[in-house]
């Protein structure tokens, strides 16, 4: 297989396979979660669980109180850099937007590539810091499973290969681009079945906890 | 009589796993922030006390029983089953080092209600026979005697007599049609009878009708702490029956955290029906009286004081502003503790920890968090609204040789009650 | 022209002076990206080089490659180099026809066995040998037979190098490239549809100078010409960096000469010398004319999902696939939901109420303590 065949495969068959598993997995996981049901709360509620659930979806992304911020500073800061960085890199790079345009039929404006590049670097630094933290912090070292390191790699490889292919470093661009796309496909394949599923289940989790707390009148 | 078994425990966990739990487990990224929020971790530095790790067996069960991949792995013999040894090992994580305080649920960035899951985990632990002896004993006493501390009606009656003598007011018992049914915690009966005095006087001033019930005076619920909905339902059922029999409008949960959770929030779900009466914490009632102008105080508390928010009231109960409104009336020198309100640190003894001797050592260690909070304030008095917090605060301060008195908010208010006759006394 | 004549003799015969010859050597060096210090060595090599015999076979092709080469205007280095070889068989160009033509090939092969250069344009059909024959001989047979005595093979054009358009999906003739068939000879792939003329002659100049084939990339192409990416050498690259893209061929962006990425330019994955060597006597290359690169020097360029589809867009229809996967996920989800609900209903039905008498397991030591 030469680089052109490889590139064609990852843009074609590989993408098909990844999409099938990704979509299948996400839908399956949503069914697995939602059909387990949740008993109706019979206690007289103080607030609208529905409203508070949605509020929690948004507000959980904001920093908590300043002491929590101080105590979990490393996790919170690297977490923000990672997630904002991923957002910029995935959704604001012109070639990525044109990919979404190709799939969904609509696009949005891109930002200039060197800025995306900067975010990619920041995101990778954040991920390296997160890995270091995971390897050295007693709690994280204790909690971490093989899957935690595996999904770290699943997230890091698309970034580094994207960076290397953009800068035409290390390997021939076609190979690098192919590996980049393949690494994203691997990410898609494993996302619904690993803790990376938080990318979409977090909305459900936040909604449930927000509404349960909201019904008690607690701002979650 | 049947007995607990691993199978019953697992079946109970299977019953507990629902959509929120599945969403929570799907969303945890092992970020470790819950550990930073848990006083059992912050004060011991022990990573095994990380809140999400306390429900790890339940996570595996969820995966094995309720996901397609997990089911396949289980069918192929690739998954690790839950064993007796494992759950025995988990007892200290689930019971000794968790007060169900809910701080972890507040900080979790993906919004997992970890505390709620530990509560569910306890269902499996108790049904499986993995609950600590201390909580089993408390549950037995609660069901058989009517109080986890073994307080019987005669003891209450003796306290009523004292209170009637001290206040010069009659304490109503089993009065049908009263507005409020007042519940007490055993600790209030045995250690803090001032509470009974206080509400007697406050209701008298407010001109409200109220009653105690000889068949259901105990508000605490060991079933909630041990994590058995069946036992909790039996205990709540007594209160519900009493409230219905006496046709009261409102049942008042006393100065106790988990009792409020048990009756106010879990109660209707435990007995599977909506209540025909209201449930309020005493602070909610007092704040309502204040707003209606029925709670009149005079004088002020000179001491510099702070308020310790009981977890079950603030984070798990939504009673945050009421104590502050009430303190506003009498305490100009009130200062907030760091992290006060919904983010307040637990005293370290809630959720059954105080009833569990195995947890004594770690409970005292966890108290260091509260000690640091109080030390930084330089205050004369700590006010709270939970008898269990109060005992732990007293114990902890004594061990740490800190001489700060602890007061219940209700009783402090009563001390400043304006001595005038209620306008509607005759008509009430 | 005899095969024994050296290049120098040939050039002299054509009235090229010593000075002109050295100038030619310098140009050849620059084509091959060699330093000027190499010029004397090149001159020495070329002076004594014998004009090699070249046999040019054309299979499934459009003659565009030969056109590209022969349309280059003289006097050019390309032309000079073609004077320096003995093109013994090229059925488009040669005067002979029929049996005579084939005899010329056979004779050239016999005379120069082991020394001649075989140039091939066009792909070879494997589906049915009858799809393409010359004088009754299938392309496959002719290639195999002619390749046997070749010193080296130069595959010219994307059809000969990678199968090209004949191989495009669904590849009705079963077309393959030269390197798919010949495994035991050095092959230089000069891809492009067509290749840049100077690239073809550059390879021949290299062979004449050094008697070897140039250094090749992983696709068998001379690195000298295929080492650079069109995108990297593109004068519109700054617009790509700034995120300024033409969205249609007649919008403002197109008029301002913005990047053509979104209009399907394959520059980022195309390796060729177009952006530097340019076409039509160095006039321009396609992007300068306002059209994206088609990636014609790359394998499968016809099947990369569409010339006007951005490179980052899927080469296939993903939406349809996703819709099926959604359905399958829902079916599997409903299945697992039914199983889960049954499991939950079962444990609820079998639920034995936990009383205070059920809080201990059957642990003899504990039971005794309890009883006492």
Language-model region placement:
Chain B
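A short, charged/proline- and glycine-enriched loop
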Residues: 175-180, 299-305
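Short cysteine clusters
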Residues: 28-34, 38, 98-104, 108, ...
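Iron-sulfur-cluster electron-transfer modules
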Residues: 8, 15-25, 55, 59-269
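Long, charged N-terminal interaction/targeting segments
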Residues: 8-51
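Active-site glycine-rich loop that binds ribose-phosphate moieties when present
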Residues: 233-239, 285-293
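Cofactor-cradling patches in redox/metallo enzymes
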Residues: 187-275, 312-329, 335-428
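Conserved beta-strand elements of the Class I
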Residues: 181-182, 306, 380-383
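Iron-sulfur (Fe-S) cluster-binding segments and ferredoxin-like electron-carrier domains
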Residues: 36-65, 106-125, 318, 352-366, ...
């Amino acid at each position: 297989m030469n680089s052109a065949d490889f590139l064609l495969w990852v843009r074609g068959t590989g993408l098909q396979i990844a999409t099938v598993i990704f979509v299948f997995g996400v839908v399956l996981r949503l069914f697995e979660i939602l059909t387990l049901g949740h008993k109706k709360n019979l206690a007289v509620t103080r607030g609208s669980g529905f409203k508070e659930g949605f509020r929690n979806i948004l507000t959980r992304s904001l920093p908590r109180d300043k002491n929590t911020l101080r105590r979990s500073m490393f996790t919170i800061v690297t977490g923000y850099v990672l997630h904002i960085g991923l957002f910029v890199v995935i959704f604001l790079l012109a070639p990525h937007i044109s990919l979404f345009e190709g799939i969904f039929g609509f696009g949005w404006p891109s930002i200039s590539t060197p800025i995306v590049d900067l975010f990619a670097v920041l995101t990778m630094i954040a991920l390296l810091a997160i890995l270091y933290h995971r390897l050295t912090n007693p709690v994280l070292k204790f909690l971490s499973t093989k899957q935690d390191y595996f999904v770290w790699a699943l997230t890091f490889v698309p970034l580094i290969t994207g960076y290397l292919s953009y800068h035409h470093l290390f390997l021939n661009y076609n190979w690098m681009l192919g590996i980049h796309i393949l690494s994203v496909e691997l990410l898609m394949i494993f996302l619904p079945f690993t803790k990376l599923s938080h990318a979409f289940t977090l909305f459900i989790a936040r909604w449930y906890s927000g509404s349960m707390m909201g019904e008690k009148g607690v701002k979650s | 009589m049947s007995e607990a078994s691993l199978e019953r425990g697992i079946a109970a966990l299977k019953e507990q796993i629902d959509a929120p739990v599945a969403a929570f487990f799907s969303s945890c990224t092992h970020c470790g922030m819950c550990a930073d929020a848990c006083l059992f971790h912050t004060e011991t530095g022990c990573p095994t006390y990380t809140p999400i790790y306390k429900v790890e067996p339940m996570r595996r069960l969820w995966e094995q029983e309720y996901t397609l991949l997990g089911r396949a792995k289980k069918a192929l013999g690739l998954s690790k089953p839950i064993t007796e040894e494992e759950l025995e090992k988990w007892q200290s994580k689930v019971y000794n080092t968790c007060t169900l305080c809910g701080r972890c649920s507040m900080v979790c960035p993906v919004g997992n209600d970890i505390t709620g899951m530990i509560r569910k985990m306890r269902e499996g632990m108790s049904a499986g026979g993995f609950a600590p002896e201390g909580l089993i004993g408390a549950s037995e006493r609660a069901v058989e005697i009517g109080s986890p501390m073994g307080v019987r009606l005669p003891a209450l009656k003796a306290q009523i007599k004292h209170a009637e003598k001290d206040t010069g007011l009659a304490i109503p018992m089993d009065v049908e049609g009263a507005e409020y049914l007042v519940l007490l915690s055993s600790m209030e009966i045995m250690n803090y009878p001032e509470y009974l005095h206080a509400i007697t006087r406050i209701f008298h001033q407010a001109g409200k009708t109220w009653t105690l019930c000889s068949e259901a005076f105990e508000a605490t619920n060991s079933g909630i702490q041990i994590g058995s909905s069946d036992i909790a339902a039996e205990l709540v059922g007594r209160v519900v029956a009493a409230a219905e029999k006496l046709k009261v409008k409102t049942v008042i949960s006393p100065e106790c955290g988990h009792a409020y959770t048990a009756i106010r929030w879990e109660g209707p779900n435990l007995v599977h029906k909506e209540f025909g009466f209201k449930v309020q914490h005493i602070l909610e009632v007092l704040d309502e009286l204040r707003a209606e102008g029925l709670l009149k105080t005079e004088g002020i508390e000179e001491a510099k004081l702070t308020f310790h928010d009981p977890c079950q009231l603030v984070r798990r109960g939504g009673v945050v502003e009421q104590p502050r409104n009430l303190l506003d009336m009498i305490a100009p020198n009130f200062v907030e503790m760091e992290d006060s309100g919904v983010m307040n640190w637990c005293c370290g003894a809630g959720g059954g920890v105080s009833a569990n001797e195995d947890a004594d050592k770690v409970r005292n260690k966890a108290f260091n968090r509260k000690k640091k909070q109080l030390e930084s304030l330089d205050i004369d008095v700590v006010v709270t609204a939970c008898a269990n917090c109060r005992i732990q605060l007293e114990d902890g301060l004594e061990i740490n040789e800190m001489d700060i008195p602890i007061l219940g908010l209700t009783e402090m208010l009563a001390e400043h009650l304006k001595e005038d006759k209620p306008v509607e006394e005759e008509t009430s | 022209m005899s095969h024994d004549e050296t290049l120098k003799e040939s050039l002299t015969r054509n009235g090229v002076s010593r000075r002109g010859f050295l100038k030619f050597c310098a140009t050849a060096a620059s084509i091959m990206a060699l330093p000027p210090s190499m010029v004397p060595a090149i001159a020495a090599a070329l002076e004594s080089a014998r004009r090699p015999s070249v046999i040019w076979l054309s299979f499934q092709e459009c003659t565009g490659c030969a056109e590209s080469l022969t349309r280059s205007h003289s006097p050019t280095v390309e032309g000079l180099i073609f004077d320096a070889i003995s093109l013994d068989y090229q059925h488009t160009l040669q005067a002979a026809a029929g049996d005579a033509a084939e005899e010329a090939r056979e004779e050239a092969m016999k005379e120069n066995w082991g020394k001649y250069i075989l140039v091939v344009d066009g792909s070879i059909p494997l589906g049915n040998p009858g799809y393409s024959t010359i004088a009754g001989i299938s392309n496959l047979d002719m290639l195999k037979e002619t390749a046997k005595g070749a010193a080296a093979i130069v595959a010219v054009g994307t059809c000969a190098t990678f199968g090209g358009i004949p191989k495009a999906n669904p590849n009705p003739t079963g077309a393959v490239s030269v390197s798919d068939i010949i495994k035991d000879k050095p092959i230089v792939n000069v891809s492009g549809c067509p290749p840049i003329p100077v690239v073809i002659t550059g390879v021949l100049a290299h062979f004449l100078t050094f008697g070897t084939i140039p250094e090749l990339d992983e696709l068998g192409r001379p690195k000298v010409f295929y080492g650079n990416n069109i995108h990297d050498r593109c004068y519109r690259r700054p617009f790509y960096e700034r995120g300024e893209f033409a969205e249609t061929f007649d919008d403002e962006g197109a008029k301002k000469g913005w990047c053509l990425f979104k209009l399907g330019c394959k520059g980022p994955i195309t390796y060729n010398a177009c952006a530097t060597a340019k076409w039509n006597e160095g006039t321009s290359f396609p992007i300068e004319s306002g059209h994206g690169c088609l990636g014609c020097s790359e394998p499968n360029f016809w099947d990369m999902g569409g010339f006007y589809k951005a490179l980052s867009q899927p080469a296939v229809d993903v939406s349809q696939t996703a819709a099926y996967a959604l359905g399958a996920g829902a079916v599997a989800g409903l299945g697992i939901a039914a199983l889960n609900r049954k499991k939950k209903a079962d444990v609820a039905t079998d639920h034995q109420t936990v009383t205070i008498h059920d809080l201990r397991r059957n642990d003899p030591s504990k039971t005794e303590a309890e009883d006492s």
